[in-house]
Amino acid sequence: MPAPTNTLLIEGTFTELADEFAQYIDALRKNEGSSLQSEISSLLEPLRQQEQSEEEPDRKQRDEVLKKLVAAAAVLNAAPEKEIISAYNLLVHLVHQASNPDMFLSRICTYLAKPITTSPQFGPTLAISILTTIFNTLTSSDSSRYHVLLAIVAVIRQSGSSYAFEALKPQLTAQLPTWLAAWELDEEEAQKLHLAVADAAQASGDFELAQSHVVQALQTIPANESSSKEARDLAVRALASALKSPAVFDFTSLTAADAIQALRTSDSSLFELLEIFTADTLDAYEDFVAATPLASISGGVLADAGEALQNKLRLLTLASIAASAPSRSLPYATIASALRVPTEDVEKWVIDTIRAGLVEGKLSQLRSEFLVHRATYRVFGEKQWAEVQGRLMVWRRSLENVLGVVRAERERFIRESLQAATEEANQGKSGEKGGKGGDRRRNPQHQQQQQQSQPSQPQQPRETELVAGAE
C-alpha cells in the first residue's frame, strides 16, 4: 500500500533500456506485426549521440520514443508471472525521464487495472504491487498519484479482496483528505475518486465506509448542477443506502446537500420518507407506507427494504420518546405501544437501541420500566429548546430549594454553636468563683497552722553525690 516515496534504481542509459524494453515487447508479441525495436531505432540514434557526447538530452525526442513503448505495453499483462513486475518497473523508470510523466503513467495505470491473463490467481496482487511502486516513486503533491490511486482502488474492487482493502483503508482514512488538497482536483475528479472508493469498500463488505464516501461524492456536486440527471442518480443512491444502512441514524449531512434537497421536486416520495426518518416516528411511517408502497418510490430502490426500514424506525422512535420523556422513566407499556411490539419484546428493542448508541439507561424488570440516562435528539428545534428550558427551570428550582435548606441549616448551626459557647463560658466563671470562696470558708485554721509551722531557721542545702561516668 502507499508508503513514503521510494526511488527505482535501474542501471543503463535511456537508449539502452528503451532498446532492451522494445526487444522484450517483440518477444512477447511473437513476431506478430511490425517490430517495435525497428520502429524506435531511428528515434534512438540522435539520443544515443547526445548521451555519448554528454549533451543535455532532447526530452521531446524521448517523448516520441515513449509514446511507442507505452502504446505497445498493453501486452505486458500477458507476460510470464515472474517477469511482470520487473518489466513494468523498467517501463516506469523510462517514463520518469519524459518531459511530462503524467501523460504516460495514466495509460500504464489503465493497463494494470485490467486482468493479468497469465496469473488469474495472483494477478491482482501483482498489479497492486506494481501500482504501489509507481505511487511511491511520485512526490506527495504530484497529481499523477490520483490516476495511480484510482487504478489501485479499481483492482481491489475487481478482486473483491477484503484483505487488500483493509491494507489500504488506513491510508484512505488518514491521508486521503491531505492528498486531495495537494493534488488540487476539480469537483468531477474528486467525485470519481470517492465513488471508486465507495465501490471498493462495498465490494469488500465495508458498507459504513462506502456510505461515507458516497456522501462525500454527493457534496462535490455544485449547487448549479444539483438538479442534473447525474446529480439526481447519485442523490437517490446515497439516500437509499443511508435509509437501508443499519449503522446510519444521523441524516444531517444528507439533508445539507443541494442534490438531496433537489429530490423534493424530482422524487418527492423519497424525500418525504427522508423527513420521516429525520424527525418522525413509526406512526407516521406506517401511514406513509399505507398510502405510498415502497416499490413505487424512485424506481423501487427500497422495494426489498420494508422490514429493515421498519426496524430502524422503531429504534429511532424509541430514541425520540426517551428524549422527550419528562420524568426520564418509560414504562414498558408505553414503549410497546409506540413500537408496535409485544411487551415481552420491549427489553430486546431497548437493548438494540442502546447498542445503536441512541440511548443510555437501565432496565428495571421489577418496575417494568426503562430509566433513561441519556437520549439522542434526532432534531433540535424550537420544541427541543423549550424542553431544555423547562428542564433547566426545574433544576434551578430544585437547586434553589437545596440552597435554602443548606443556608438555614448553616445559620442554625452557627446560632446554636454561639449559644452553647456562651453558656459554657458563663458556667465556667460561676464555678471558679464558688470554688475559691468555699476553700476559704472551710480551712481558715489550717491555713493559719501552715503559716505558724514554717521553720524560722533557713534550711541547709542537701549533699549531692556526683557519679563520674566510665572513661
From Swiss-Prot:
- State whether keyword Transmembrane helix applies: no
The cellular location(s) given in this protein's UniProt record come to:
Cytoplasm
- Annotated region (Disordered), positions in chain: 39-61, 419-471
Residue ranges crossing the lipid bilayer per the database entry: none
Q: Which InterPro entries match?
A: ARM-type_fold (IPR016024), COPS7/eIF3m (IPR045237), eIF3m (IPR027528), eIF3m_C_helix (IPR040750), PCI_dom (IPR000717)
The reply to whether Cytoplasm figures as a keyword in the UniProt entry is yes
List, as start-end ranges, the regions of compositional bias called Low complexity: 445-461
PCI domain ranges (all copies): 206-377
Q: Single GO molecular-function term?
A: translation initiation factor activity
Under the heading PROSITE patterns, the entry gives: PCI
A GO BP term, please?
formation of cytoplasmic translation initiation complex
Which keywords label this protein?
Answer: Cytoplasm, Initiation factor, Protein biosynthesis
Ranges of biased composition (kind: Basic and acidic residues): 430-442
Please provide, in alphabetical order, the Gene Ontology terms of the cellular component aspect for this entry: eukaryotic 43S preinitiation complex; eukaryotic 48S preinitiation complex; eukaryotic translation initiation factor 3 complex, eIF3m
Family to which this protein belongs: Belongs to the eIF-3 subunit M family.
How it assembles, according to the record, is: Component of the eukaryotic translation initiation factor 3 (eIF-3) complex.
Q: What does this protein do?
A: Component of the eukaryotic translation initiation factor 3 (eIF-3) complex, which is involved in protein synthesis of a specialized repertoire of mRNAs and, together with other initiation factors, stimulates binding of mRNA and methionyl-tRNAi to the 40S ribosome. The eIF-3 complex specifically targets and initiates translation of a subset of mRNAs involved in cell proliferation.
Q: What is this protein called?
A: Eukaryotic translation initiation factor 3 subunit M
